[in-house]
Amino acid sequence: MHGECDVWYFDSAGFCLTPSIPYAWQPIGSVIEVPTSAHNRRINVLGFLTRHNALVPYVIEGHIDTDIVIECFEQFSQHINRRAYVFLDNASIQKSRKFIRHIPQWVKRGLIIKYLPPYSPELNLIEILWRFMKYYWLPFSAYMSLQCLLQAIEDILQRFGTDYTIAFEMK
């Protein structure tokens, strides 16, 4: 990374067996069937992302809460090697008293929390990663089972920055 500090964007995204398919092409008169599950189990990905495609993801099967978000920040803050600004949205689990109580401890480690303006997801660059994963990179086969979905998500996250990249404009 360049400069005196690092800038990261944090957010979480949920993935389930109902595919996010914006459109599909098929011959006239044919039908494409996408199997879905009646079970609504989720895979949640929490992550820290830079404009340079550095990604620190945390994959959680099931529900996320303040304690899980705190643990992600705790782990992340212990591995930074210089001042890091983390921009995040105003989700209640990230604005809870419990979360806020940990901020001074993270600041001592060089991790500075900055909240984005309310209702401004376009300012959180990691939202672009979630969109690419859901609408472009996850194959149809990922939705066959929760295990297939987990495997596909982990594959994308592992290969992000090399095989999967996002070209953020620097203005």
Residue ranges and their predicted role:
Residues M1-K171:
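Short functional hotspots at interaction and active-site rims
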